[in-house]
Amino acid sequence: MKSRRAGRVMWIALAVLLIPALLLLGALLLVSPGTPKPFLDAQGRPLTGSISEKSYVKINGIEQGMFIQGRSAHNPVLLYLHGGLPDHFLTDRYSTGLEDIFTVVWWEQRGSGLSYHPDMPPDTLNPEQLVSDTLALTDHLRARFGQDKIYLMGRSGGTFFGIQAAARAPQRYHAYIAVAQISNQLESERLAHRYMLERYKDEGNHKMAKRLEEAPVGDTVPLPDAYLRVRDVAMHELGVGTTRDMNSVFTDMFLASLLHRDYTLGEKIALWRGKLFSGSRLWNTQLSTDLTQKVKRLDIPVYFLHGVHDYTVSYPLAKAYFEHLEAPVKGFYTFKQSAHTPFFEEPDKMRQILRADVLTGTNGLADPQ
């Protein structure tokens, strides 16, 4: 009798555990069809001449994935280089309107998201390889869309190798567009640490202030693990991270990625596995490199777009880099209501700059110099 009762209790306990798990799995599968929605015309039919697809291309021996979206496949091609985490999923919340102007290629680079492979040799994930991949994908896009040149846009970590690709092969690009351009990232981290510590002290948040005081940022790489554990949490809490209105990596990034319908469930898992895989391998090189000494000139128009509230990548350091960078045409654009991602936070201003200045190779809307 006791054994039967114990058996029933065990089955009830298993049901209590399994049923919610199965319901959650079913819900995740339901919101993970993995197919981008088409652009629609006024009658609700697929828009003629538009493109909205998930595409895979073998680049330098590794199959790499990307989303390609545009209301007209005849528009100029814009190759977008993301930072540490592919951010196409954030377009669910933040409409950029970039696809109205360009055929946008949201490439998920080697080791990240759609291009994460667990068996990929770690030593192939380095900035030089990413520059080579960028140039190879550029040539593929030029051939596919029949365009002699395309536009190159990098954000945050993507600017680290993006500006190097633009310097190496200017003949392939109309212009280089930098959103939160990295310059001297180790100094940027010191400035961020100082700012966040002062903010928490001013606000009376002794717990977070103590965590930062116990994790100083010095002159050596790698940075302390204790600082890296608190960094993203603090930046989002203080409104100086991805966007000013994000206050939690978990709710605003992780949960948002789980709800993104363009990924399958497996691809959503790969998104975060890739972040763990690729983050530190690229991060330490970025920290130990002073780009202001590595790339001093570009032979194409250059546009720096930066949120004044950005402490993920320093606004004043980017501005100082811009002032010394040589280019035939250049413009620096301050986004006063933005942190790290102006095209999510101030999309109207971003589109105005792209149409009026970038597409025409001018800088009439740039900050006064």
Where do the PLM segments sit?
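Glycine-rich "HGGG/HGxG" loop immediately N-terminal to the catalytic nucleophile
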Residues: 88-89, 111-125
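Conserved alpha/beta-hydrolase
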Residues: 98-117
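Conserved acidic catalytic loop of the alpha/beta-hydrolase fold
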Residues: 129-149
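A catalytic-pocket lid/entrance helix-loop region that shapes and gates access to the active site
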Residues: 168-219
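Alpha/beta-hydrolase
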Residues: 206-293, 300
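Short beta-strand/loop motif that positions the catalytic acidic residue
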Residues: 298, 304-306, 310
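Conserved alpha/beta-hydrolase "acid-adjacent" motif
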Residues: 311-317
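Catalytic histidine-centered segment of alpha/beta-hydrolase-like enzymes
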Residues: 338-347, 351
